[in-house]
């Protein structure tokens, strides 16, 4: 839990710093002077009020975390805009009459956040064809991860995605973690599991845990535990694999790993060598491992295919580069 307190403290500190910067940035803007805020004190008061009003409006309209994300986008782009326009002004030899840097930052923030919202609420099917010398024959797999039920779409939206999966006519459906989220309600979890139970496949549906499925907070807050989730999944014919493997049709293995977050919770999980050491290496092995951070060991253990989630499409620069270090 210590890491989460550290993250919370950093988030609060960065948010406060961002609000102070934005308040000062608004106070210094030529636009503020045009509103009749001539004195320094009145400008600062206006800047602080505008920054707090903007942040509060975002928090009430979206939620607190999304308000923080929007604030940081605006702050970073304001800093970048001020830097670029300072260079231009240096060569221009005279100040700008309008706050072009601020306007550019707002427009770019709006464009970036709108694009993010659109991508977050629209799901695309990506097709991959994988060839292997092993005798597995044709196998049609549907994989999904990070549905985080209730976060970007509700159970009705999830049911629509299930229908799209069914139209792919899969031999098997694999879920690589974060099926539910810390904010998912018990009823949403139950309805989503029922939707999974409607899938018609040759070999069934298999699930491996992600870092959010068991929840980071008090189970009472969302109304169910990790064990409750397992019960509902099994009730709907979903096979849950936790450091376990199963041989299917004497052709291929599905190996589901415990998530890396189990280690952070003080719980053990098997190494890749331990998971694969007793398997027939002539048969194709498919690993479900939510967090893609163990590729070297998976290669050494001679895993054939590793399927993961967690990165949500790579996230944003530069955080995507930082994540590659861990």
Regions found by a protein language model. Name each.
Residues 1-121:
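Non-catalytic terminal accessory segments
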